[in-house]
Amino acid sequence: MRAKDLLGRRGEELAAGYLESQGMRIVDRNWRCSEGEIDIVALDGDSLVIAEVKTRKSLAYGHPFEAVGVAKLARLHRLASAWCRDHELRMPCRRVDVVAVLDDGAGQPRVEHLRGVG
């Protein structure tokens, strides 16, 4: 597996652990359909949360949050609808969160979480 893929996988593990520590329940991970992939699907109380995870070694190419623009947010909303259809679930309270993981491999990774970004 490529170093980039390993970093991404580690970031998703850290993000899932962080979300669980915040009281969320992870219900699906790496769900795919023809339109794309959802990194993490979680329940936060009555809300369905679609979490996009962005992991970086450094800020050299910008903060991980900067990698989630308008087009990506629109795709995540479409994916949320597709996930609900696929699971025959009607969840009126949906939100998209972004979890940023900064992990240079030398120290404690930093996890940051933006709720309801779009």
UniProtKB/Swiss-Prot annotation:
Domain of life where this protein originates: Bacteria
InterPro entries hit by this protein: Restrct_endonuc-II-like, tRNA_endonuc-like_dom_sf, UPF0102_YraN-like
Gene Ontology molecular function terms on file: nucleic acid binding
Family: Belongs to the UPF0102 family.
PANTHER family linked: UPF0102 PROTEIN YRAN
Protein name (Swiss-Prot/TrEMBL): UPF0102 protein Arth_2474
Natural source organism: Arthrobacter sp. (strain FB24)
